[in-house]
A protein has these predicted regions:
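Acidic/histidine-rich catalytic cores and adjacent linkers
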Residues: 100, 107, 116, 124, ...
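Short, positively charged, Gly/Tyr-enriched micro-motifs
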Residues: 43-45, 49-59, 86-121, 194-307, ...
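Polybasic, low-complexity terminal segments and linkers that are predominantly intrinsically disordered
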Residues: 1-145, 624-669
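Basic, low-complexity segments
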Residues: 137-219
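Electropositive, glycine- and tryptophan-enriched low-complexity nucleic-acid-binding patches
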Residues: 208-215, 238, 242, 312-394, ...
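Structured nucleic-acid-interacting core domains from mobile-element enzymes and related host factors
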Residues: 162, 167-183, 214-215, 259-342
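A short acidic (Asp/Glu
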Residues: 305-308, 405-412, 435-439
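Short interface patches used for recognition in eukaryotic signaling and trafficking proteins
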Residues: 153-156, 185-186, 222-229, 243-248, ...
Length: 669
């Protein structure tokens, strides 16, 4: 019970007087005397008595009850789980009986939680991810109770052996672990990497065998699943060894066995990726009956600069938000096996070996030249096989400002397509970036050039009162918006580009709704105006993006952002921080193709090609990942999220962090 606050008794007063006398000359006593100035004699006596008695401590029962968790705007209502009174037999340490999957006392959910498969009516499928994956999250996925008692677990082998030894021998009906004076039972393990065969020998010489993994073909399932899991998260043999060591588990397969597993996984992933790209090509035929389509082509390298040994060329369809991967090409200008044998063998012996090595198609080198020439070579290869592979012709090439790849396919001999020209389209995002780069170069070019403004001589057009980084980024963004907001309308697009220059020059006639003077509150019309000498210096730069020939290539309003997003996913599965061979890079490309086009749930087909049953928990995981991908895309597509990204870009410019530096390897981990 709580103590009641009130006046002290006579006995308490006597003890308080002696204790209060000690407080008169202490530091704490001086503080009490200062507080006593605002109290009466009686109130101060009560305050001192409470101090001596000690204020009772509040408990959880004294406070108001906490409200229950009912979810938020992201999770929705949370359903309370039913508490099962009956305990599972596995909780009883003295019990030696087995668990029956049909026993109702075992608390096994009959279907996935609602968060895994959201209500299709509450999900926005207007995003790119939503349109691709809307079939992956339609309704709840129901599993049988027997299916939930499958899969793999982290099990302490000592506890497993102790439990098995309590079971009765089928021959002598005695526990397997019961020992006599002259005979004993023992356990022997035959381990094959992550799979084990446990042999229990009873004192009656009867043997009982327990396998920790079933076989898929000639290999154990766990030994095939483990490399597949490591590859999907961007780890290699060394990372697998470190993971198993920390888990106090046996080491992974030997490197040669690891390579054999990788070859089988590569073969299965290649088949699924080819089927996915074929389906994407058929969708383009369904959307457009013509065989001439518009594609977006771009290249990426395993290492920055021009010293990379591995390069990738990706080609995606341009179909609104539903852009998918149609074809890829992985190039390498080296072969690890050739490099090793060249140092070990003589010249004549190496030539003989290399001839056999090439005839067996084991050499991984498929490109001769620099890393910079990989993109044009890969682009031409992809274009030449378009008709035979997909029955399509890529007649509209959407690329960046680098014209090497486009020139390669346009001027190829013999021509890629007979009597058909390939038209160049500009990426609106790269046009926007070039605008910012030209303005930055102009500021550097005129850094020491004197100008006269308001009777004063100033140097350069940048700095305070001039063209700063924040102003360049805003002009760059307005230029991109002028192109994207007037798709298909060349005069309006050109007028919108020049309206940016006029706005900064103090002319508001052609401004859009983004201008402060057009707003309801009537903002300052000269808020973003620049000095006349600055506007005259940068006026020639606006002639480039406002040119009719360039704007005609931007009427489509498309960008290469889908290619960049696809490249980012590739290097998540094969990080740039770790060097690897071309086969490992190609495996990452194929796996990313499957996920990018059809979602994580399509990876179940890879398990089928490997003759592995994916299982209930793999299906649950992949469905949850697809659901999270759609939710994340919806969250990032809101106006608030877009505004926050714009503000972060401006902050990076103010702090001097160039946006180009964020494309370093591992920068997005």
């Amino acid at each position: 019970m709580r103590k009641e606050w009130g006046c002290p008794t006579a006995n308490q007063s006597a003890s308080y007087e002696s204790r209060s006398h000690a407080l008169q000359f202490s530091k704490h006593g001086r503080k009490l005397r200062q507080k006593a100035q605002c109290f009466t004699a009686d109130s101060f006596y009560q305050y001192l008595s409470l101090l001596m008695m000690g204020q009772p401590r509040k408990t959880r029962a004294d406070r108001p009850k906490k409200r229950g968790w009912n979810g938020n705007q992201h999770t929705g209502p949370v359903k309370k789980k039913k508490v099962v009174e009956n305990k599972s037999p596995i909780d009883n340490e003295a019990s030696t009986s087995t668990i029956d999957a049909s026993d109702e006392s075992v608390n096994i959910p009959s279907k996935l939680p609602p968060s895994v498969s959201p209500d299709p009516k509450s999900v926005d499928f207007n995003t790119a991810s939503g349109q691709k994956l809307k079939n992956n999250v339609q309704g709840d996925i129901v599993f049988d109770k027997e299916e939930l008692l499958t899969g793999f677990r982290f099990v302490d082998i000592k506890l497993l052996i102790d439990f098995v030894q309590t079971l009765l021998c089928p021959t002598c009906k005695r526990p397997l672990g019961q020992n006599s004076r002259h005979s004993h039972s023992h356990v022997k393990e035959h381990r094959t990497n992550q799979a084990s065969k446990l042999v229990f020998t009873c004192q009656c010489k009867d043997k009982s065998v327990l396998f920790t993994s079933k076989k898929c073909g000639r290999v154990y399932e766990s030994n095939r699943r483990f490399p597949l899991a490591m590859f999907s998260i961007g780890k290699h043999h060394t990372g697998a060894k470190r993971f198993l060591g920390n888990m106090n588990m046996p080491p992974p397969p030997h490197r040669q066995s690891w390579r054999n597993h990788k070859k089988q996984i590569e073969k299965a992933t290649k088949l699924v990726a080819s089927a996915s790209m074929q389906e994407a090509a058929q969708e383009m035929k369904t959307t457009d009956p013509h065989t001439d389509i518009q594609v977006s082509c771009d290249g990426t390298w395993h290492r920055r600069g021009f010293s990379s040994k591995n390069g990738i060329v990706t080609l995606l369809s341009v179909n609104g938000r539903n852009s998918k991967v149609i074809d890829t090409e992985t190039l390498a200008n080296h072969c690890d096996a050739c490099a090793k044998h060249k140092h070990k063998k003589g010249e004549a012996e190496f030539e003989q070996w290399h001839k056999t090595h090439t005839q067996k198609k084991l050499c991984e080198k498929n490109h001769t030249g620099s890393a910079g020439s990989m993109e044009p070579a890969g682009t031409e290869t992809i274009f030449r096989r378009s008709v035979t592979k997909h029955g399509l012709r890529y007649t509209q090439y959407l690329g960046d400002g680098d014209s090497k790849s486009y020139s390669r396919v346009k001027n190829a001999q013999p021509p890629v397509y007979d009597n058909t020209d390939i038209t160049k389209l500009e990426c609106c995002g790269h046009v926007q970036k070039r605008m910012g780069r030209h303005l930055t170069n102009k500021v550097s070019e005129l850094k020491k050039t004197p100008f006269v403004h308001n009777g004063k001589t100033v140097k350069g057009i940048g700095g305070r009162g001039g063209l700063k980084k924040t102003a360049i980024l805003k002009i760059q963004g307005h230029c991109g918006a002028a192109i994207r907001n007037n798709v298909g309308d060349l005069p309006a697009m050109k007028k919108a580009v020049w309206a940016i220059w006029e706005h900064r020059n103090g002319q508001r006639d052609s401004c859009g709704t983004w201008c402060p003077s057009k707003k309801a509150d009537g903002g300052d019309p000269n808020k973003n105006a620049l000095p006349p000498y600055v506007m005259e210096a940068i006026k020639p730069i606006f002639s480039t993006p406002a040119d009719d020939s360039l704007l005609e290539k931007c009427l489509h309003g498309g960008t290469q952002n889908t290619n960049e997003s696809f490249h980012h996913l590739i290097w998540e599965r094969c990080p740039k921080t770790t060097f690897c061979g071309p086969s490992r890079v190609e495996l990452a490309v194929d796996d990313t193709t499957v996920v990018f086009n059809n979602g994580e749930l399509r990876r179940l087909s890879i398990f089928q090609e490997l003759n592995i049953e994916a299982g209930v928990y793999a299906t649950q995981c992949f469905t949850a990942l697809d659901s999270a991908r759609i939710s994340r895309a919806c969250a990032l597509g809101t106006q608030q999220a877009k505004r926050q990204r714009q503000l972060r870009t401006l902050d990076n410019a103010v702090l001097g962090r160039d946006t180009e530096e964020f494309y370093l390897s591992g920068a997005h981990e």
